[in-house]
Amino acid sequence: MQRNRVLAFLLLAAQLLVKIPETCAKFPALIVFGDSTVDSGNNNQISTVLKSNFQPYGRDYFDGKATGRFSNGRIAPDFISEGLGLKNAVPAYLDPAYNIADFATGVCFASAGTGLDNATSAVLSVMPLWKEVEYYKEYQTRLRSYLGEEKANEIISESLYLISIGTNDFLENYYLLPRKLRKYSVNEYQYFLIGIAADFVTDIYRLGARKMSLSGLSPFGCLPLERTTQLFYGSKCIEEYNIVARDFNIKMEEKVFQLNRDLNGIQLVFSNPYDLVSEIIYHPEAFGFENVRSACCGTGYYEMSYLCDKMNPFTCSDASKYVFWDSFHPTEKTNAIVANHVLKYDLSRFQ
């Protein structure tokens, strides 16, 4: 059933690439947690090497501004916010250019490079997930002071909470740090992460959140950075990693079912991007892409963050032909397609 829906979506791709439909569900705000897939600039304000607030990042964003989003333009939450009838971009909570009035209709607490496992955030000195929750608590206090208890509580309970996290736990942590490989099997580590995700959902539920979309993992074995390690084997996807992503998604979906059963009044939707992103990767021409093996920025094989800079002479001129912007992150066009799918098939389930 899921695959049929993705294939139907593929056939309509030419019409749906950048047109973001408004979903029938209405939310007063979009509140975002997670990693670089959804970080709109929080890492700009912390001491870490993982930043993207410089050109050519953001070259296709409004006014060509590099905001700290890991893309050439907007990221999925921006398009989702627009599709919900809210703002066309979700502001980062730590950005001093914004205040609580801006955050009342949307706010991002995500930090690029973070993961469910606290050890993942330590690799690049970024915000751990628990810190994102602490900022969310602070936000609630500020919101109540700004709007009053009743209105603020209404926004907190009726908002859509978008959660996208998990890839870094494998690529920056489990497969990079030998001690994790020794301590856990892949299966055990997956359950360890899912337990943390369940605790996180429960934590923000207790703080008043009720409507949440929890994203699964994409086929991260097909990221250009991972393909580069297979350069002498035709730059193939690392199927071992893709199997891990699929298995993780199956386990996470089971946990989502359990949480919906156990937490009274919660509406938790599992948003699985795996099949859609796989279709984009294996049938790029159907979506108007020409290059899926390498990224637009630099050589496209390994550049990310500071290695993806405006002095690199190899950066492509038209990012819309590429699935990936840098070796780890999608282009604005890919983000729009994914957001469109989430709006059409996942968020439409909210009542």
Swiss-Prot record:
The keyword Glycoprotein applies. Its EC number is 3.1.1.-. GO terms for biological process: lipid catabolic process. Glycans are attached at residue 118. Its main location: secreted. SUPFAM superfamilies: SGNH hydrolase (SSF52266). The keyword Ubl conjugation does not apply. Keywords: Glycoprotein, Hydrolase, Lipid degradation, Lipid metabolism, Secreted, Signal. It comes from Arabidopsis thaliana. PANTHER family: GDSL ESTERASE/LIPASE EXL3, OS06G0636700 PROTEIN. It is an enzyme of class 3 (hydrolase). Belongs to the 'GDSL' lipolytic enzyme family. One of its GO terms (cellular component) is extracellular region. The active site is at 36 (nucleophile), 326, 329. Residues 1-25 form the signal peptide. It is found in: Secreted. It holds the Pfam family Lipase_GDSL. One of its GO terms (molecular function) is hydrolase activity, acting on ester bonds. This is GDSL esterase/lipase At4g26790. Gene3D superfamilies: SGNH hydrolase.
